[in-house]
Regions:
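A residue-level signal for conserved active-site and pocket-lining positions in enzyme catalytic cores
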Residues: 81, 197, 255, 278, ...
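ATP/NTP phosphate-donor binding region
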Residues: 1-105, 112-123
Length: 355
């Protein structure tokens, strides 16, 4: 890993970027040096080749006006990415003529910290900012693309700013989870088996070599209902006008809602393979679980009889047993007192670059 090469390459690309043309650009790279894209040799070599290629491609664009030289800041632990972003938000409030580009150079955890800070920023400040999420983690489900080249294309080609919603989990007032912080996801928020896999993977981090997520997917497919009772959930789906789309009562292994369709989680597991943003998976025998598990990886599960897939703005659900929820890798245990709970798209708030 050569951080000097990394920052110099991005600085040179930003110097010729087409983001916010006609305005001074302030570019800050927030780097998590512990991210897999830096520490895993094969990934770093691939990123080095791509950065070299795009450093050369950027030269075809004219040099742009920068407010100052590109700044790079290393994170130093959990929450650091959010703290750095909040400092940039404070600075941006004082300099409305400048466009602030935050490049998140880390994994999905770093991306989430940055976007959480942006979510809470004043709207007039967010309108002068954008975040670019490089695929420098191991899974990269929350990056702008799993391909480094496709993300860097957003710097050297004409782009516009598009505001993306988040997904918020709300729980019953007075329940055990209601006093916690805001529950937000910027990719997929899920309840049930996947949240259990995420919870166990988090517990194993640093203790087991290799991809423990895939290990726990295999374990959960066989034994999840030994850990948590899979019982009926009452589910109600609503559109953005609060009109009911569908309601049902099923024993569910999984309930997942994405910011949009065409989204992956768990290291590119293709749970939302088309335009629809909600996927529910019913309880089923073990042999069916094993069959569907392999189909989810390739996004071929949508026509299975155990799968309910739809578009919704809000999903309300209630049950009578504890169940885990996960928000982009962070988990919370929902108790019966937390129901009814809901997953809902927020207003569009996260400024992203789009071609």
């Amino acid at each position: 890993m050569d951080l000097d090469f990394f920052t110099q390459s991005l600085a040179e690309i930003c110097d010729h970027s087409l983001v916010a043309p006609g305005r001074p650009l302030d570019c800050t790279i927030i780097i998590n040096p512990a991210a897999g894209g830096f520490t895993i040799g094969s990934k770093w070599k691939s990123h080095t080749r791509t950065l070299t290629e795009y450093r050369q491609k950027a030269q075809a664009n004219p040099q742009r006006t920068m407010s100052e030289s590109v700044n790079s800041i290393l994170t130093d632990g959990r929450g650091s990415g959010g703290n750095i972003t909040r400092a940039l938000i404070d600075e941006a409030q004082k300099k409305p003529d400048i466009f602030y580009l935050i490049i998140s150079a880390g994994g999905d955890g770093t991306h989430c910290e940055i976007m959480y800070a942006l979510y809470n920023a004043p709207a007039h400040v967010r309108s002068n900012m954008a975040v670019l999420r490089l695929p420098l983690g191991t899974g990269n489900d929350g990056a702008d693309s799993a391909s480094m080249a496709k993300v860097l294309d957003l710097l050297i080609n004409p782009v516009h700013i598009e505001f993306s919603p988040a997904i918020q989990l709300t729980t019953a007032y007075g329940g055990p989870a209601s006093g916690n912080d805001l529950f937000l996801a910027f990719n997929i928020l899920s309840v049930g088996l996947d949240a259990f896999v995420t919870h166990m993977t988090n517990k194993m981090k640093g203790k087991v070599a290799g991809d423990s997520y895939k290990l726990w997917v295999d374990i959960a497919a066989l034994f999840y209902d030994r850990f948590y009772k899979v019982d009926f959930l009452d589910v109600r789906a609503l559109d953005d006008k609060n009109q009911e789309i569908l309601s049902f009562r099923e024993k569910l292994l999984l309930l997942a809602m994405g910011v949009s369709g065409h989204r992956t989680y768990g290291s590119q597991q293709n749970i939302l393979p088309d335009d629809r943003n909600v996927c529910c998976v019913k309880q089923m025998p073990i042999h069916r679980k094993l069959a569907i598990k392999s189909q989810v990886t390739k996004g071929r599960h949508t026509n299975n009889r155990e799968v309910i897939i739809l578009n919704a703005h809000r999903i309300e659900f209630s049950g009578s047993h504890p169940i885990l929820a996960q928000m982009d890798g962070e988990t919370v245990l929902l108790q019966p007192e937390d129901f009814p709970s809901a997953l809902e798209l927020t207003a569009p708030v996260i400024p992203l670059l789009k071609m």
